[in-house]
């Protein structure tokens, strides 16, 4: 996809903060399975809509499964246009990188939120010894620890083993390493009386992460980056499939922006907020994400030239 040259005197009054698993990447294939998602993202970027991916995924996953398909669809030309901005915040704010016409830039990491190599090695060994049939250790994470469902395993089989894994990893990290950790109704303080980490289950993985990490932190970092590059739109949309994704909109609302959140998995319970919460009818996950992007593409996205 290429775009005709355009002089930019003003930018669209819209910015997007997007979770990836669910609204962009299919939770089944873990890739962008709907082609229009790719082309609509490229068109919106070309129109000058600032777009940030705020995800628990690693930079490697976003580079391979999101940025590379976008580049193949013309993202480089889109990001050379006046006002175009794209950014990635990974591991819920533990790492981040610019995305420009050359692809993803150098990844920066906040080492202060890492569990450390020894703890990661222990979790890796636990998975290999007891849980390798149903899940795998994500080698691409730089700060948090993630263990993900094997793609060929049925969800019901994974869920039963996921609970057993979480109990086991809690015992390893608190007992062997003295890590201050929260897990559902259980908690163990470290030697300083603190609990700086938590076990956070998702529908396809278990994340072990700093309590400082979440989608509001990622949103704040993306806004800071975009503000360095130009004026910010007043109107924003955030899109996600989990309850924690509302925190992106919470951050924007607290900062005084006009925001609405698009919940692509409302069956988990729509949260009450002081801003609008939108659903895409009966559509869920990436089908809902595709419908959302198609709507805004029709409003702002330029046609290929």
Which positions does each model-derived feature cover?
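A short, Lys/Arg-enriched amphipathic alpha-helix followed by its capping loop at the start of a domain
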Residues: 6-17, 36-49, 252-255
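Active-site phosphate-binding/coordination module
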Residues: 35-139
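Well-ordered, non-membrane alpha-helical segments in soluble/globular domains
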Residues: 35-38, 67-73, 114-127, 158-183, ...
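Asp-based phosphoryl-transfer active-site loop
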Residues: 9-31, 53-55, 88, 219
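Mg2+-dependent phosphoryl-transfer enzymes with acidic/Ser/Thr/Gly-rich catalytic loops
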Residues: 6-12, 209-211, 216-305
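Short loop/turn segments at strand-loop or loop-helix junctions that form parts
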Residues: 16-22, 90-94, 99-101, 139-142, ...
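Conserved acidic, metal-coordinating active-site core of Asp-based
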Residues: 130-237, 244, 248
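A short acidic (Asp/Glu
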Residues: 62-66, 99-100, 147-150, 246-252, ...
């Amino acid at each position: 996809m290429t775009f005709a040259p355009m002089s930019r005197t003003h930018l669209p009054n819209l910015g997007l903060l997007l979770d990836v698993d669910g609204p962009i990447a299919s939770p089944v294939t873990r890739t962008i399975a709907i082609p229009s998602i790719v082309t609509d993202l490229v068109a919106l970027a070309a129109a000058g809509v600032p777009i940030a991916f705020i995800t628990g995924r690693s930079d490697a996953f976003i580079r391979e499964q999101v940025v590379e398909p976008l580049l193949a669809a013309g993202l480089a030309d889109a990001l050379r246009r006046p006002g175009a901005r794209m950014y990635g915040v990974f591991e819920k704010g533990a790492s981040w990188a610019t995305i420009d016409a050359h692809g993803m830039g150098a990844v920066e990491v906040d080492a202060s939120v890492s569990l450390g190599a020894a703890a990661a090695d222990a979790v890796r060994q636990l998975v290999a010894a007891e849980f390798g049939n149903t899940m795998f250790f994500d080698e691409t994470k730089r700060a948090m620890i993630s263990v993900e469902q094997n793609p060929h395993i049925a969800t019901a089989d994974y869920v039963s083993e996921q609970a057993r894994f979480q109990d086991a990893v809690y015992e390893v990290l608190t007992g062997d390493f003295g890590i201050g950790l929260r897990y559902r109704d259980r908690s163990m303080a470290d030697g300083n009386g603190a609990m700086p980490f938590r076990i956070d289950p998702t529908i396809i993985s278990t994340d072990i992460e700093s309590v400082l990490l979440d989608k509001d932190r990622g949103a704040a970092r993306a806004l800071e980056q975009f503000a360095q590059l130009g004026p910010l739109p007043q109107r924003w949309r955030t899109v996600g499939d989990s309850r924690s994704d509302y925190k992106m909109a919470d951050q924007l609302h607290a900062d005084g922006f006009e925001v609405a959140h698009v919940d692509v998995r409302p069956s988990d319970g729509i949260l009450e907020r002081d801003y609008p919460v939108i659903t895409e009818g009966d559509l869920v996950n990436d089908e809902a994400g595709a419908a959302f992007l198609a709507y805004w593409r029709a409003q702002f996205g330029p046609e290929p030239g």
